[in-house]
Design a protein with these regions (language model features):
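Extended, charge-rich alpha-helical interface modules
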Residues: 2-119
Length: 119
């Protein structure tokens, strides 16, 4: 199946059932909806980490560096042994950084799609 055929297969139900008038309208609607759901997904992930650690990403990164250097602790991980705290903190830091990166990227996509629709 060619790319064009794949696009037709995806958008045809939107046209047949009168949800959209053109392929471009259907593709735009799908793209905007998907981007918005991704923004929500990553915003929720970022909010989760902020809630758990009660701090910003930059401050958490500083806390993780201090923890790894045996100069600090992270209250949210106090229930764990020191080695487990380090592993969990490093894992969460990596996930949090990725969530922030993808949130920014999806927000940019969402803005671009909104601007394109307004043009």
């Amino acid at each position: 199946m060619s790319e064009r055929d794949a696009v037709k297969t995806i958008v045809t139900p939107f046209l047949v059932h009168g949800i959209c008038k053109t392929e471009a309208e259907a593709l735009g609607m799908l793209a905007r909806d998907y981007a918005q759901r991704q923004v929500t997904r990553y915003a929720e992930r970022v909010a989760h980490f902020r809630s758990v650690y009660q701090t910003s990403l930059d401050q958490f990164a500083d806390q993780v560096r201090a923890l790894c250097g045996a100069r600090g602790e992270i209250a949210a991980l106090a229930r764990l042994a020191k080695a487990a705290q380090i592993v969990q903190a490093e894992d969460d830091l990596e996930e949090w950084e990725a969530a922030e990166r993808f949130l920014a990227r999806w927000q940019a996509v969402e803005t671009d799609l909104r601007n394109a629709a307004a043009a």
